[in-house]
Each structure stands twice: as structure tokens, then as C-alpha cells.
From Swiss-Prot:
Name of the protein: ELAV-like protein 3
Keyword RNA-binding recorded: yes
One GO BP annotation of this record: cell differentiation
One term under GO cellular component: ribonucleoprotein complex
GN (gene name): elavl3
Job of this protein: RNA-binding protein that binds to AU-rich sequences (AREs) of target mRNAs. May also bind poly-A tracts via RRM 3. May be involved in neuronal differentiation and maintenance.
Transmembrane residue ranges: none
Length: 343
């Protein structure tokens, strides 16, 4: 397999790299992380030896790790490579990013350093003009820094009309802070009222209860009763994120091409996509949400799906939201398995 991979790599290298790195990788990494790479969307049957051989063909590797599920031992579809020489890391990005392996197109980018400068850079924006699209929102915010992801919530019925609410994730917190200073309370072109720009609450802080209470209050018209966490039934340590699959009680099927699919159960009949966006958006980049509806009544059948691009953020969302009470219902949140309901 390795020989075929390297042959494919040499054929594709002349075409240049593929699309840019995803959320948890950036070509603007700090100097102390110029050798450390994250590799996403690897074929699930790829072994540690094949992974090392592929990236070892570029240059000397100090360490590499193919990340596996703690329970099943199956590859989670991503890994880390640390080169001795920064030039080799740069070459690996230019050569291997966008390489097609089997049915996958791998993404190679610098692993983002774990520092306060890149944490908590996710913004919640409301009262946007209904005519503003995602590109226009990015243009409005891009003057303050590099945007990693953005999303505007749309009406479920039309699938296109904006709800006037969006999320913007910057590369660095200081950029997000500047965006708040510059845009919060301002009226962009086409707006009938000032927009609100604020940080999406950080789930890693000791304010998880306040976060979900706030989220519940935003949807209070659809739900009744307070929001509570079932602390006696569901507990977790924020530092043991790898144990989330044990908490959820399921094994993973691995990421989809779009990211990690999360199953959300026990939603009320009145729940819609905006509820899922507001619940999961603050935890990280969400690429898609879907509430499963009854064809006759168009009411929620009690469950839905959320896709997030980053495993750690998805795991944190599960650990924080599994067992929380939304209205009079206790949510059950886990990674989607093949045995669960299908849309």
C-alpha cells in the first residue's frame, strides 16, 4: 500500500496542494510549532507503519502518531507528525496536502499550538440584516483578522432566508476582541438595527451551567421550565476528554468527510435547527445541523444530528451537553453510530 501511496503522491504533487487546512490547522502557526503537523481525513484502514512511511518519505521524523479510538482501536482518521527540520514540515504540507488516498483527500496543516492566544475566538452575532449572506458577513468581519469559519443561520422552511444570526471564528482571540470593539452596537449597511457581537461562551470554563441557561433563555418561547444538569447521573472531568466515548456509552464510526457526526436525542416536538446551532455553536466549528421531522406534522421526531469538524470540540460538546435538561427534557448526546436512527 505504501508504494502505491508514494506513487500516487508523486503523480499528484505536480498538480500542487489541494484545499487549505481545516479548522485545527493553520499555515500561520507560531515559530515553535513549525515542525508539528496535523493530518486529517486519512483512510480508516491506514496503519501506523504506512502513516509513518508516507510522511517519512519527505524527511526525518521525530515522532508520529495515528490517533485511534480508545475502545475499538480503529483509526479515527487523523494523526500528528513532528519533523526534525521545519523545512521538511513545510515541504510535507506543499506536497501531501490534497493528496487523494483511496476515497479520501487528506488535509495536512500545521497543528495549532495550545496557547491562550488562539482559544475562545468564536463570536456570536445577532440582528444581522436578513439580506446579508455569508460572504458579506465575512467581508464585514475580515478587517479585524483571519477568519477560520463562519456561518449564517437560515430559515428551515425556505432553506435560504437568513435568520439574522451567525457565528464567526477568528484565528486568534485578540482578533475577535477587536471585532467586538469595532462592530458591536454598529449598524452595517442594510441593517435596520444595531448588531450584537459577543463571545460565544467558552465551554471549558466553569460557566457551563450559565452557558446552557443562556441558551435555554434564547429559546424560552418554545420550551418551558428551567435548564438543569443531571450532575448525579452524568459527571466528567474536563481533563479526561479521551473518556468521552465511555461517557456516551457508544463506539465511534469515525469522522465523515465533513467531520464528526453527533446524535442528539430527546428533543421536543417544537425543536428546530436553530436550537442545535445555539447549543453546539459555542463549542466549536459546526458544519451542519439537522432535525428529523415527521412528514405529516412537520414536528421534530425527537432527535437530530450535528456535524462538527474537530474531534476535541465535538467530544467537549458531548461531555457538556449529554444529560443536560432543556425545558422538561433531558438530552442524550453521543457520537453517531451505525445502529442509530437514520435520516
Amino acid at each position: 500500500m505504501v508504494t502505491q501511496i508514494i506513487s500516487t503522491m508523486e503523480t499528484q504533487a505536480s498538480n500542487g496542494p489541494g484545499s487549505v487546512g481545516i479548522l485545527n490547522g493553520t499555515n500561520g502557526a507560531a515559530d515553535d510549532s513549525k515542525t508539528n503537523l496535523i493530518v486529517n481525513y486519512l483512510p480508516q484502514n491506514m496503519t501506523q507503519e504506512e502513516f509513518k512511511s508516507l510522511f517519512g518519505s519527505i524527511g526525518e521524523i521525530e515522532s508520529c502518531k495515528l490517533v485511534r479510538d480508545k475502545i475499538t482501536g480503529q483509526s479515527l482518521g487523523y494523526g500528528f507528525v513532528n519533523y526534525v527540520d521545519p523545512n521538511d514540515a513545510d515541504k510535507a504540507i506543499n506536497t501531501l496536502n490534497g493528496l487523494k488516498l483511496q476515497t479520501k483527500t487528506i488535509k495536512v496543516s500545521y497543528a495549532r499550538p495550545s496557547s491562550a492566544s488562539i482559544r475562545d475566538a468564536n463570536l456570536y452575532v445577532s440582528s444581522l440584516p436578513k439580506t446579508m449572506n455569508q460572504k458579506e458577513m465575512e467581508q464585514l468581519f475580515s478587517q479585524y483578522g483571519r477568519i477560520i469559519t463562519s456561518r449564517i443561520l437560515v430559515d428551515q422552511v425556505t432553506g435560504s432566508v437568513s435568520r439574522g444570526v451567525g457565528f464567526i471564528r477568528f484565528d486568534k482571540r485578540i482578533e475577535a476582541e477587536e471585532a467586538i470593539k469595532g462592530l458591536n452596537g454598529q449598524k452595517p449597511l442594510g441593517a435596520s438595527e444595531p448588531i450584537t457581537v459577543k463571545f460565544a461562551n467558552n465551554p471549558s470554563q466553569k460557566t457551563g451551567q450559565a452557558l446552557l441557561t443562556h441558551l435555554y433563555q434564547t429559546t424560552a418561547r418554545r420550551y418551558t421550565g428551567p435548564l438543569h444538569h443531571q450532575t448525579q447521573r452524568f459527571r466528567f472531568s474536563p481533563i479526561t476528554i479521551d473518556s468521552v466515548t465511555n461517557l456516551a456509552g457508544v463506539s465511534l464510526t469515525g469522522p465523515t468527510t465533513a467531520g464528526w457526526c453527533i446524535f442528539v436525542y430527546n428533543l421536543s416536538p417544537e425543536a428546530d435547527e436553530s436550537v442545535l446551532w445555539q447549543l453546539f455553536g459555542p463549542f466549536g466549528a459546526v458544519t451542519n445541523v439537522k432535525v428529523i421531522r415527521d412528514f405529516t406534522t412537520n414536528k421534530c421526531k425527537g432527535f437530530g444530528f450535528v456535524t462538527m469538524t474537530n474531534y476535541d470540540e465535538a467530544a467537549m460538546a458531548i461531555a457538556s451537553l449529554n444529560g443536560y435538561r432543556l425545558g422538561d427534557r433531558v438530552l442524550q448526546v453521543s457520537f453517531k453510530t451505525s445502529k442509530q436512527h437514520k435520516a
